[in-house]
Amino acid sequence: LALRYSHYLGTHADLMPGAEAFLRRLHGQMKIVLVSNGDSVIQRNRLFRCVFTPLLDNIVISSEKGVSKPDPRLIEIALAECGCTDKAEAVMVGDSATADIPAAVNAGIDSIFVDWKNMGYKQATYTAKNLAEVEQILLKS
């Protein structure tokens, strides 16, 4: 049953509305790295089927690195793999108040919390309600 469920998860993924267009607009203007705490097999299968995967400069999956968010080492691995030596140039965009934003804080980089549910989370450097607001913040930085 667990194997069937893992297979199902790996073959099904729902894109956030506007995510592909968002990444297409940013592609080439900055490096885009996906950092995931997900299971490697499931995430790789999803990304294999995903239309925006070619827009990513790198993919860092916790189960492949032996460390997961909010541990700052996963962010440091992502920065090193994409050649970012200046943390002031890095921004973590995420919607997890327990993994994404604490990982950014722990790694000493700016963060944008995508507050889909209007939770009012205050630990991030910036807060955005949607991808359009994320894009505005990124392009101003």
Can you name each region flagged by the protein language model?
Residues 3-33, 72:
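Short, acidic loop-to-helix structural element flanking the phosphoryl-transfer center
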Residues 1-4, 55:
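Extended, well-ordered alpha-helical scaffold segments
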Residues 20, 24, 33-141:
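Asp-based, Mg2+/Mn2+-dependent phosphohydrolase catalytic module
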